[in-house]
C-alpha cells in the first residue's frame, strides 16, 4: 500500500492529508523540491526514555520525504535535552542528569532507526546528535557567535514563551529562555554539515524553526525552510495519544503491542479516516474508498481494524502485530490455547488488570483480590450463577481451589466474569 510521493507536488499531497499546519514561503519551497532531492531534518529531544504517539506524525513525515527521494536527518537532542524546551509549557521542566539524558539519547536513536532507511544510496538517512557541536562549545563562543544574532525584543514576543513571561507564579529561567538559540543553531549547523534546507516539527515548534531560518540566513547566507505538522486533536476535544494509564509509548516495554493495537481499535468513527491519512501510507483514494465501503456496509466499520493493523505493523513489526491480533482474538473467543508465554507477559504488563497471588488461594478470594467481586459473599453467588471462567473454562463450584494445571506456563491464570471483565493472576 506504500506510495511514492512525487517530489514536485509533495507539499500539496501532505496538505491533502491534513499534515501541514504552517509552512514558510511555500512557493519557494515547492520550487526547491521540484529541482531535485533535498536534505531535511526533524529533532527529537530525549525528555523520556521513549518516544510517544505525539512524535509519530513528524517521524512518519520524515519517512514520507525519504520515500519521495529526499535525505532525512534524524537529530536527537543530546544537548537540548539537557536544557528543556519551554515552548507552550506551563512550568519549568525538571533538569535531568547527563547520564540519564545520554541513556535516553541511545534509546531514542534506536527507536527512530527502523522508520528510516540508512542504507539506500544517495538519500540514506543520517542520525545526528546536537551534543556533538554543543558539548565542547564555550560560553564566550556561544554568546558572540550565536547570541549576537538574536534580538531579545523578538524572543520575548514569541507565542511559545509569552504565556510564561506573563505569569507571576511561573517565570522562565535563563536556561530555558536560551533553548531557542540552541535549536536555531542546530538548523544552521545541519545546513552547513549536510546541506539541510528544511526543518519539520510539531506546530508548537514554529518559533524555534523560524529562529533557525533567520540564523542560517545570517551565518551562511542560505535560504532554508520550515514546515510544521498539526498537533493531533480528537473530534470530541479530548487529548490525543493519552489513555487512563497515561501516554501511549512506542517502546513495547512501556506500552505493549496489544495495548497499542487496542488503542487504535478504539478510535472514534469521527476520527478514524483522518487518522488513516496522518498515520498510514495508504493513498487518499484507498482511504476514501474504505470510508465509502464502511458507510454502505451496514456493519461495524472496518477502518479501525485497518488503522490498528497498519500502525501496529509500522511501530512493532509483523511479529508485534500478530501477537496483538492473537491476544485480541483469544480474549474475544475465550479460547486461550494459541497464547504464548510472551503473550501472557504482555497481558500482565498492561493488557488486563493484574493481581499477584500466593499459591493455595481459592477462587472466591481471587475474585475479591482482583476486584472482579466486592466480597466473598457476592463472589459465591456469581460463581454459582455460572458467570466465571478460569482460562476460558466455566467454573461453578464456589469452594474451588486453584490446581497446578490452572497455572499456565506455571505462572498465569486468566479469570473472566461475564463477557468482558478480565483479570490475570500472576502466581508468586
UniProtKB/Swiss-Prot annotation:
Q: Where is this motif: 'KMSKS' region?
A: 239-243
**Superkingdom of origin organism:** Bacteria
Alphabetical keyword list: Acetylation, Aminoacyl-tRNA synthetase, ATP-binding, Cytoplasm, Ligase, Nucleotide-binding, Protein biosynthesis, RNA-binding
One GO biological-process annotation of the entry reads: tyrosyl-tRNA aminoacylation
Concerning CDD domains, the annotation shows: S4, TyrRS_core
A single GO CC term for this protein reads:
cytosol
What's one Pfam family here?
Answer: tRNA-synt_1b
> Can you say where in the cell this protein is located?
Cytoplasm
Does the UniProt entry include the keyword Acetylation?
yes
Annotated residues for binding of L-tyrosine: 41, 179, 183
Recorded catalytic activity of this chain's protein: tRNA(Tyr) + L-tyrosine + ATP = L-tyrosyl-tRNA(Tyr) + AMP + diphosphate + H(+)
Q: Which residues carry this modification: N6-acetyllysine?
A: 148
Where is the short sequence motif 'HIGH' region located? 46-55
GO MF entries: ATP binding; RNA binding; tyrosine-tRNA ligase activity
Q: Which SUPFAM superfamilies match?
A: Alpha-L RNA-binding motif, Nucleotidylyl transferase
Return the EC number: 6.1.1.1
Q: What binding partners and quaternary form does the record give?
A: Homodimer.
Primary role:
Catalyzes the attachment of tyrosine to tRNA(Tyr) in a two-step reaction: tyrosine is first activated by ATP to form Tyr-AMP and then transferred to the acceptor end of tRNA(Tyr).
Q: State the family named in the UniProt similarity comment for this chain.
A: Belongs to the class-I aminoacyl-tRNA synthetase family. TyrS type 1 subfamily.
Please state what the protein is called: Tyrosine--tRNA ligase
List the source organism.
Escherichia coli O1:K1 / APEC
The upper taxonomy is: Bacteria, Pseudomonadati, Pseudomonadota, Gammaproteobacteria, Enterobacterales
Amino acid at each position: 500500500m506504500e506510495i511514492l510521493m512525487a517530489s514536485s507536488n509533495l507539499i500539496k499531497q501532505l496538505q491533502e492529508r491534513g499534515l501541514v499546519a504552517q509552512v514558510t514561503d511555500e512557493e519557494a519551497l515547492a520550487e526547491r523540491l521540484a529541482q531535485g532531492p533535498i536534505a531535511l531534518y526533524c529533532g527529537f529531544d530525549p525528555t523520556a526514555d521513549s518516544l510517544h504517539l505525539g512524535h509519530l506524525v513528524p517521524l512518519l513525515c520524515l519517512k514520507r520525504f525519504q520515500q519521495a527521494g529526499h535525505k532525512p536527518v534524524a537529530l536527537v537532542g543530546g544537548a537540548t535535552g539537557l536544557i528543556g524546551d519551554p515552548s507552550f509549557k506551563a512550568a519549568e521542566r525538571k533538569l535531568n542528569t547527563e547520564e540519564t539524558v545520554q541513556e535516553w539519547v541511545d534509546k531514542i536513536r534506536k527507536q527512530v532507526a527502523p522508520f528510516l532507511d540508512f542504507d539506500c544510496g544517495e538519500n540514506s538517512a543520517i542520525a545526528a546528535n546536537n551534543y556533538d557541536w554543543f558539548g565542547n562549545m564555550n560560553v564566550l563562543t556561544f554568546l558572540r557567535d550565536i547570541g549576537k544574532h538574536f534580538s531579545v525584543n523578538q524572543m520575548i514576543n514569541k507565542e511559545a514563551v509569552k504565556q510564561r513571561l506573563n505569569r507571576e507564579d511561573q517565570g522562565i529561567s535563563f536556561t530555558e529562555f536560551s533553548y531557542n538559540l540552541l535549536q536555531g543553531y542546530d538548523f544552521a549547523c545541519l545546513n552547513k554539515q549536510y546541506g539541510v534546507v528544511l526543518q519539520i516539527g510539531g506546530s508548537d515548534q514554529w518559533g524555534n524553526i523560524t529562529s533557525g531560518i533567520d540564523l542560517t540566513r545570517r551565518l551562511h547566507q542560505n535560504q532554508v525552510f520550515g514546515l510544521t505538522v498539526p498537533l493531533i486533536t480528537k473530534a470530541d476535544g479530548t487529548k490525543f495519544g493519552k489513555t487512563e494509564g497515561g501516554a501511549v509509548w512506542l517502546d513495547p516495554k512501556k506500552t505493549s503491542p496489544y495495548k497499542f493495537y487496542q488503542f487504535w481499535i478504539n478510535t472514534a468513527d469521527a476520527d478514524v479516516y483522518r487518522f488513516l491519512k496522518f498515520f498510514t501510507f495508504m493513498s487518499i483514494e484507498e482511504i476514501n474508498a474504505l470510508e465509502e465501503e464502511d458507510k454502505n456496509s451496514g456493519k461495524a466499520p472496518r477502518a479501525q481494524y485497518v488503522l490498528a493493523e497498519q500502525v501496529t505493523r509500522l511501530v512493532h513489526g509483523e511479529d508485534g502485530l500478530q501477537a496483538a491480533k492473537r491476544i485480541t482474538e483469544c480474549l474475544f473467543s475465550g479460547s486461550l490455547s494459541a497464547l504464548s508465554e510472551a503473550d501472557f507477559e504482555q497481558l500482565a504488563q498492561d493488557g488486563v488488570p493484574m493481581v499477584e497471588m500466593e499459591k493455595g488461594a481459592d477462587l472466591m478470594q481471587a475474585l475479591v483480590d482482583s476486584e472482579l467481586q466486592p466480597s466473598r459473599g457476592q463472589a459465591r453467588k456469581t460463581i454459582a450463577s455460572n458467570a466465571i471462567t478460569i482460562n476460558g473454562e466455566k467454573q461453578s463450584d464456589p469452594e474451588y481451589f486453584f490446581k497446578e494445571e490452572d497455572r499456565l506456563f506455571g505462572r498465569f491464570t486468566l479469570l473472566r466474569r461475564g463477557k468482558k471483565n478480565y483479570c490475570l493472576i500472576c502466581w508468586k
